[in-house]
Swiss-Prot record:
GO terms for molecular function: alpha-mannosidase activity; carbohydrate binding; metal ion binding. Belongs to the glycosyl hydrolase 38 family. Binds 1 zinc ion per subunit. This is Epididymis-specific alpha-mannosidase. It comes from Pongo abelii. One of its GO terms (biological process) is mannose metabolic process.
């Protein structure tokens, strides 16, 4: 059944299959030396630098300089940047410049890391790519043009669009489903032109090469030796290199006695691969994980081997050459043959065998996934706040150099954690701790920066005390909205007193509510309704009622009341729905069943539709003993049977207030358990008149608690409805575009192979209604029954597989996690209009900076006095920042500066502002919001000053788009992209039009004060 599922995808491959190799003469093998250097995974970055990574660059640079024919490709930038900044000598730096100029050293991808494709958000992919590209362009004046995405666990359809927007000419991937790869090899369909975005189509297509079954590693088995082949430097040793230079498993040296045997092995492998591709050009990767730490011994053995093969090329039918990835793709492009087109479908999920579905990592280390996204959101807010502080003119005494350092530290950390063994949760515990430490340190620095900016603005008023804790005068909260839309939402603060007055900048009372904390009995949750224009602040004074000034008539925050329901056993009968309790706002009525303490149904006012909705927690019990069968681990999800309920009893309480009503459900493993393992806290907001609360009203906010789990359990939240969904769900690729996910029955492992990543949103629907889930971290998601959607929240695993144990890659995660989902229910038209903006509102919630009042509340500028930055509802401010790059936007001028060798004398440019705009909607998705949108950047950015110049750039900022000419590849579709990445546009003007799904990048220059 698995093979049959792929027949529709294989049909165009079979039709295009040529009768044979399309060229006479020998096969031409491009030997591409490389080292796969994971930024983390088993060892920390510093451990890897000490053991092998620094030696890779030191020895490769030395060896490339010794032979004109030698080549090497470098991929992730983190190790190279550490080597460049802390290890490389002046001579080695000069050699690198020379090798790059000669094309013998080539940077591919060029990002800080090789990011994961399944569980990363597009914004963070762009960030880490921009980080690496900015360094490479600033340092060398080069711009990577090819990708080498060989190790992410599955391929997203967002990736071809991302790399096309970055200016790449070709894309290389590897890990796709095993049975699909086998079929594509058979059909010689591993190369195609990928149009990943249905809206952008050929405008942002890219030629794509899928590696064959050998992937990125050199075939290590050679028939004449019991050692691995072609790895003459052996295997890296930790914690540091051996003093005698002898490593484990070093391949037998090439000698006159065995050179024919080596040549036969290499040629046989090249010919095997040639049969899987349409041209006689064969890419032969030479390398693997942690290779080339001794490039001398590598090239010393490969050089005579390649010379031997070439001297017998006519007889062997193969010629070989050292090559970069660019050399290979240029040779392919020169052939100018016709390639098939692949549409916007992705290559997820990824399986390597029938019982090895790599769908567990969609959820592994949920806490790290959540932290990574929170760090990204904080960085996003800090970038725009600092930019707005600097423009139109700095208003205080903040040191811009220090400020930029705080942002750069978090940029590095957020980029680092996008690695395909980081945010995936597939790293060892000590490496997880490294990522957490880097993120936490970076977040602390940016919070200090944001607090400093606030204090700079408040300095004349001096309302905050330096001490911590609740002072007698109360608290002061500054709330910053990083989105370029006006946002109405609830912010939640923790206070130590049960009665409070909340006032705004002008001293006016603010709608607020006080209630018992969900976490700590001794404190209280204070909920404040706030409306904040784009890139603006609100300031609130919070004082205990006992400390209010005498004689004032300020209304206090309303106090919520709690209605408790006794513990109910899990019912095994269908007699439910007889005693329902309604909880309502102006958009929804949630009906709760008193007999079960579970949700029963939701009525949506606008469509006047009621949908049965029940939620519960289940667990998959999985095997950890390899002797007993397939196992689950950090990567794999391998359930032996269906999930079972993880609770026997549930308590419920309703906390009802004038502003917010919360439904709290606590799930216990048995009737007498003292502590609950799972919880759902659902919130409906009652938006007062006079506030635009469309988004706030039309969502049910849910926070869950899961854990600690028992060993070898995988916890899911299952939402069951009466929607006739046909077991079809939709989940997103990287928060950018949606993929239809029909349930597929396989011979084996159907549960796991029908799990998909949800990075930001998912939904299911029937002809009348749609239920949308929005998330603030990645999860695995599936529909295991009609009208059902289940979200995997947490995993705790241990197994005795030697490989996992040897690398400490078991997942004995005893943490308690608190993921958040927002639910939207309504018609297709309603949810289409709200889904994208609501997802952004969840990802980029207002940032609250909290301090103690030292005296009377200050009078500060309210939103009416601030100049907001506002975009239309279908256009998202993807970034507004001051990158601080030290290069000229003029490529010729920058190249001249590099040749003069004065890069170190150039100061960080604090005047250039990076702006990126993202159209959120697909073509035809909404009759209004899917239209192209025209904006005047002078008007949009007037709060920052007078715009004097607008430069449109490539996605990562390194190309002037007027100078960017990507390769065009011949296709059989009848449509052909021109040689530019976008339609012709008027150059440099402030009035721009952004089309559906476009992401456009600009450098903005303001009039200096």
């Amino acid at each position: 059944m698995g093979r049959l599922y792929w027949l529709p995808l294989l049909a165009p491959l079979l039709l295009l299959r040529p009768p044979g190799v399309q060229s006479a003469g020998p096969i031409r093998a491009f030997v591409v030396p490389h080292s796969h250097m994971d930024v983390g995974w088993v060892y920390t970055v510093q451990e890897s630098m000490q053991a092998y990574a620094a030696n890779v660059y030191t020895s490769v640079v030395e060896e490339l300089a010794r032979g004109q024919q030698r080549r090497f490709i470098a991929v992730e930038q983190e190790f190279f940047r550490l080597w460049w900044g802390g290890v490389a000598s002046d001579q080695q730096k000069h050699q690198v410049h020379q090798l790059l100029e000669e094309g013998r050293l080539e940077f591919v991808i060029g990002g800080q890391v090789m990011h994961d494709e399944a569980v990363t958000h597009l914004d963070d992919q762009i960030l880490q790519l921009t980080e690496g590209h900015g360094f490479l362009y600033e340092t060398f004046g080069i711009r990577p043009q090819f990708s080498w995405h060989v190790d992410p666990f599955g391929a997203s359809a967002t990736t071809p669009t991302l790399f096309a927007l970055a200016g790449f000419n070709a894309h290389l991937s590897s890990r796709i489903d095993y049975d699909l790869k086998a079929a594509m090899q058979e059909a010689r369909g591993l190369q195609f032109v990928w149009r990943g975005s249905p809206s952008l189509s050929e405008q942002e297509e890219i030629f794509t090469h899928i590696m064959d079954q050998y992937s990125y590693c050199t075939p290590s088995h050679i028939p004449f030796s019991n050692r691995s082949g072609f790895y003459w430097n052996g295997v890296a040793i930790f914690p540091k290199p051996p003093p005698d230079g002898v490593y484990p498993n070093m391949s037998e040296p090439v000698t006159p006695a065995n050179i024919n045997l080596y040549a036969e092995a290499l040629v046989a492998n090249v010919k095997q691969r040639a049969a899987w591709f349409r041209t006689p050009h064969v890419l032969w990767p030479w390398g693997c994980d942690k290779q080339f730490f001794n490039a001398s011994v590598q090239f010393a053995n490969m050089n005579p081997l390649l010379d031997h093969i070439n001297s017998h090329a006519a007889k062997l039918g193969v010629s070989v050459q050292y090559a970069t990835l660019g050399d290979y793709f240029r040779a392919l492009h020169t052939l100018n043959i016709t390639w098939r087109v692949r549409d916007h479908h992705d290559f997820l999920p990824y399986s390597t065998e029938p019982f090895q579905a790599w769908t567990g990592f969609y959820t592994s280390r949920s806490a790290l996934k959540g932290l990574a996204r929170r760090a990204s959101a904080l960085l996003y807010a800090g970038e725009s706040m600092f930019t707005h502080y600097m423009w139109p003119a700095p208003c205080g005494h903040l040191d811009p150099t220090w400020a930029l350092q705080q942002l750069q530290q978090l940029r590095w950390a957020v980029s680092e954690v996008q690695h395909h063994d980081a945010i995936t949760g597939t790293e060892s515990p000590k490496v997880r701790d490294m990522y957490v430490m880097h993120l936490a340190s970076g977040m602390l620095g940016v919070r200090k920066l944001m607090a400093s900016i606030i204090l700079d603005k408040l300095q004349p008023q001096a309302p905050m005390a330096a001490s911590s804790g609740a002072g007698p005068a109360g608290h002061f909260a500054s709330v910053y909205n990083p989105l370029a839309w006006t946002v109405t939402t609830i912010v939640t603060l923790t206070v130590g007193f049960p009665g409070v007055h909340v006032t705004d900048e002008a001293g006016h009372p603010v709608p607020s509510q006080i209630q018992n904390s969900t976490e700590t009995p001794s404190v209280y949750d204070l909920l404040i309704l706030t409306t904040i224009p784009g890139l603006s602040y609100r300031h609130y004074s919070i004082r205990p009622t006992a400390g209010a000034q005498e004689g004032t008539q300020e209304p206090a925050a309303t106090v919520a009341t709690t209605l408790q329901f006794g513990r109910r056993l899990r019912r095994r009968t269908s007699h439910v729905g007889r005693h329902l309790v309604p909880v309502a706002n102006d958009c929804y009525t949630v009906l709760l069943d008193q007999d079960t303490n579970l949700m029963h149904s939701i009525w949506e006012r606008q469509s006047n539709q009621t949908v049965r909705v029940t939620q519960e927690f289940l667990e998959y019990h999985v095997n950890g003993d390899v002797k007993q069968g397939p196992i689950s681990d950090n990567y794999l999800f391998t359930p032996g049977k269906a999930a079972v309920p993880a609770w026997e009893a549930v308590e419920m309480e309703i906390v009802a207030g004038q502003l917010v009503t919360e439904i709290r459900q606590y799930f216990y493993r048995n009737m007498t358990a003292r502590n609950y393992t799972y919880a759902i806290r659902s919130r409906l907001t009652h938006v007062p008149q006079g506030h635009d609360g469309e988004l706030l009203c039309h969502r049910i906010e849910q926070e869950y608690q899961a854990g600690p789990l028992e060993l070898n359990r995988e916890a899911v939240l299952r939402t069951s409805t009466n929607l006739n969904s046909q077991q079809v769900i939709y989940s997103d690729n990287n928060g950018y575009q949606m993929q239809r996910r029909p349930y597929v029955s396989y011979v084996n492992n159907s549960i796991a192979r029908n799990y998909y990543p949800m990075v930001q949103s998912a939904f299911m629907e029937d002809g009348k209604s749609r239920l949308v889930l929005l998330s603030e971290r990645a999860h695995g998601i599936s529909s295991q029954g009609n009208g059902q959607v289940e979200v995997m929240l947490h995993r705790r695993l241990w197994n005795n597989f030697d490989w996992d144990l040897g690398y400490n890659l078991t997942l004995n995660d005893t943490s308690i996690v608190h993921p958040v989902l927002w639910l939207l229910l309504g018609s297709w038209s309603l949810t289409t209009a709200l889904r994208q903006r609501s997802a952004m509102a969840l990802q980029h919630r207002p940032v609250v900076l909290f301090g103690d009042l030292a005296g009377t509340a200050p009078k500060l500028p309210g939103p009416q006095q601030q100049e907001a930055v506002t975009l239309p509802p279908n256009l998202h401010l993807q970034i507004l920042s001051i990158p601080g790059w030290r290069y000229s936007s003029n490529h010729t001028e920058h190249a001249q500066n590099l040749r003069k060798g004065n890069r170190g004398e150039v100061q960080a440019d604090l005047h250039r502002v990076l702006l990126r705009l993202h159209h959120l909607y697909e073509v035809g998705e909404d009759p209004v919001l899917s239209q192209p949108v025209t904006v005047n950047l002078e008007a949009v950015l007037q709060a920052l000053g007078s715009v004097v110049a607008v430069e449109e750039r490539s996605l990562t900022g390194t190309w002037d788009v007027s100078m960017l000419h990507r390769w065009s590849w011949r296709t059989g579709s009848g449509r052909r992209r021109g040689d530019t990445t976008s339609p012709s546009r008027p150059p440099g003007g402030p009035i721009i039009t952004v089309h559906p799904k476009e992401i456009r990048t600009f450098f903005i220059h303001f009039q200096q004060q």
